[in-house]
Amino acid sequence: IGDWLRAQGVSSAIVLSSIWCRCQRTAEELKYGPVQIEPALASFFDEPLKAKKLNQQLQQRIANALPNKKNQALILVTHHVNIREFVGKDIGSGDMILAQVNAKGQMISFRHYPSP
């Protein structure tokens, strides 16, 4: 996935990951540098009542990152339940979402990319 992202022009990125080890491994394998663990990206599959709260925390984290990211991509590695809560769509394992967000970190529009 990291090679594919580079081929698309993503040369520099801030990478945030769920604490879950499979997400961390994926994030590290992108090879964009240190991975930051973000609690708002943790799966709530077994605790669906946490969905709204974690999504709000994620939006705040994105909003906080926007002013400082400069020309870097902001890559989030997380779980299908989190993605569904954020964009309202189920996607497959390894698929990617390119999301346009507003200054509050709220999704405006998105494009779905199947796993390369």
Model regions and ranges:
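Active-site-proximal alpha-helix that buttresses catalytic centers in soluble enzyme cores
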Residues: I1-P39, F44-P48, K53, K89-N102, ...
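Glycine-rich phosphate-binding loop signature in dinucleotide/nucleotide-binding domains
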Residues: Q8-V10, A65-Q72
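Beta-strand elements within well-structured catalytic alpha/beta cores of enzymes
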Residues: L16-S17, Q72-T78, N82, A99
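Short amphipathic alpha-helix initiation/capping segments at coil-to-helix junctions
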Residues: A51-N55, L76-H79
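A short, acidic, amphipathic alpha-helical segment used as a generic capping/interface helix at domain edges
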Residues: Q57-P67
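Flexible, glycine-rich active-site loops centered on histidine and acidic residues
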Residues: E85
